């Protein structure tokens, strides 16, 4: 079992439109970071008797591949301080619906990178030509219906090329 969000630094610098009568918080200008991955949000969160209503979109304005690597769980990644990287990655998506004890908002998160690379200082070879095209989707609001489409994962180490596709469902 891997905890994907353990000791993750989250920062948010935002101007919010606050409607106290409706318990509604609307994102105006904002800049957020999950570790070093920058994100921008549009939309709102509203507190209701049943839970919380989400109508949010989000995206990375731009992000180096190194910032994206910072999202890898600590169980799989050592320090990234001295890792050389090149290329960019993007994360975008939406969450729309009500969060309750039994339901989550419907969501779609797209993760992409094209022609990125990284190399740890103590390893002789780099990982190059990294292509990622992944989507994490929930179309029903039931957590067990969440699925992951790994439409493409490709990279090379020296002359060896790795290609993968997968669909992960409950």
Describe the role of every protein-language-model region.
Residues 24, 74-79:
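Extracytoplasmic loops and strand-loop junctions of Gram-negative outer membrane beta-barrel proteins
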Residues 68-73:
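Short, flexible, mixed-charge acidic loops at enzyme active sites
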Residues 1-50, 59-67, 85-100, 109-169:
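Hydrophobic lipid-interacting interfaces of membrane-associated proteins
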């Amino acid at each position: 079992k891997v905890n994907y969000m353990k000791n993750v630094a989250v920062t948010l610098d935002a101007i919010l439109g606050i409607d106290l009568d409706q318990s509604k918080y609307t994102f105006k200008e904002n800049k957020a970071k999950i570790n070093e991955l920058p994100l921008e949000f549009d939309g709102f969160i509203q507190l209701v008797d049943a839970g919380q209503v989400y109508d949010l979109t989000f995206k990375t304005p731009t992000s180096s591949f190194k910032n994206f690597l910072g999202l890898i769980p600590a169980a799989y990644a050592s320090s990234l301080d001295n890792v050389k990287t090149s290329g960019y990655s993007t994360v975008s998506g939406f969450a729309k619906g009500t969060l309750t004890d039994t339901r989550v908002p419907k969501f779609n998160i797209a993760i992409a990178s094209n022609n990125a690379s990284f190399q740890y200082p103590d390893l002789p070879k780099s990982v190059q030509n990294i292509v990622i095209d992944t989507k994490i989707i929930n179309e029903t609001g039931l957590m067990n219906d969440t699925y992951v489409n790994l439409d493409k994962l490709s990279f090379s180490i020296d002359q060896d090329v790795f290609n993968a596709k997968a669909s992960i469902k409950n």
